[in-house]
């Protein structure tokens, strides 16, 4: 929440979004990130991370919804080991924000990934690298300039 008040981010259209995620023990294994309304990732041979729910504001009531979605995806037994609640930044249009800060030279941003950060961060990182090092244009859907110009 404090990032919304940090001076160098005050021109960036971010908002706070809350949600739940879980760590569960299961024999489900995948080498891929599964992204079907929630993300499911193996963190070890026996554990998965599943999340996240999405609430505007600060509601800690998404665990049942998360478990129902997980049941649909993995179709295997699991034991919940840990329930997490967190707050993350999201852009106002729920798309990533990538690019050069509008007023501070040499400050580049990847933010606003919300709950899809695990699946979108590799793409956003590559886009930013190509922008900085190869002078390529950023994908207009993630370019922070869509809010700044």
What kind of feature is each model-predicted range?
Residues 2-105:
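Active-site substrate-recognition segment that forms the wall
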């Amino acid at each position: 929440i404090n990032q919304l008040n940090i001076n160098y981010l005050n021109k960036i259209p971010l908002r706070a979004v809350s949600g739940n995620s879980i760590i569960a023990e299961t024999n489900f294994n995948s080498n891929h990130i599964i992204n079907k309304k929630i993300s499911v990732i193996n963190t070890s041979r026996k554990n998965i991370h599943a999340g996240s729910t999405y609430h505007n504001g600060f509601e800690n009531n998404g665990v049942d919804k998360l478990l129902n979605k997980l049941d649909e995806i993995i179709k295997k037994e699991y034991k919940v080991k840990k329930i997490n609640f967190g707050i993350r930044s999201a852009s106002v249009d729920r798309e990533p924000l990538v690019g050069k800060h509008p007023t501070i030279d040499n400050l580049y941003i990847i933010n606003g990934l919300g709950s899809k950060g695990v699946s979108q961060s590799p793409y956003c990182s590559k886009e930013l690298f190509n922008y900085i090092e190869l002078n390529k244009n950023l994908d207009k859907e993630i370019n922070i300039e869509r809010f700044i110009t």
